[in-house]
């Protein structure tokens, strides 16, 4: 299985990568830190899953120029271009943005779900593994 993580926070990306590596066998994981490089890599290579942060810098060399709705734009761009599935994994407070993420899941067939990332909790780990394994 091949997975691409598009995440600008290196600690969060490593946390997600570690979680997947410990729970999924025969997995290859790549990480991109910016919207532009992530989308290009997703087009160029064949991934089973793409895990997307909602807010990403447009370019890796300018981490301050942020695209606040990166997940929606990536889903729109990849909807017809990839056979892979996408998961939104973003840090947000309970109740915040859940309607927005639900609409993305409902609106894009490649999006199988969203996960509220919180490094102090374990629930996100279980959710992301369930989504990857298809037992949500």
Where are these regions (language model features)?
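Conserved acidic carboxylate
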Residues: 7-8
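Hydrophobic/aromatic residues positioned on beta-strands within the core alpha/beta folds
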Residues: 89-90
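C-terminal output helix
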Residues: 96-102, 115-132
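Amphipathic alpha1 helix at the N-terminus of the CheY-like receiver
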Residues: 11-22
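Conserved phosphotransfer microenvironments
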Residues: 51-81, 97
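Acidic, metal-coordinating helix/loop segments flanking the phosphotransfer/catalytic sites
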Residues: 17, 30-49, 56-59
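Helix N-cap/capping motif at the beta->alpha junctions
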Residues: 11, 31-40, 64-71
């Amino acid at each position: 299985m091949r997975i691409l993580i598009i995440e600008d926070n290196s600690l969060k990306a490593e946390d997600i990568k570690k979680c997947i590596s410990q729970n999924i066998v025969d997995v290859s994981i790549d990480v991109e830190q910016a919207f532009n490089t992530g989308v290009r890599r997703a087009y160029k290579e064949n991934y089973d899953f793409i895990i997307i942060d909602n807010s990403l810098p447009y370019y890796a060399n300018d981490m301050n120029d942020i695209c606040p709705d990166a997940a929606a734009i990536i889903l729109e761009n990849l909807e017809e271009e990839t056979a892979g599935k996408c998961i939104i994994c973003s840090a947000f407070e309970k109740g915040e943005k859940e309607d927005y993420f639900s609409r993305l899941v409902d609106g894009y067939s490649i999006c199988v779900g969203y996960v509220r990332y919180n490094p102090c909790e374990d629930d996100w780990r279980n959710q992301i593994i369930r989504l990857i394994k298809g037992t949500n």
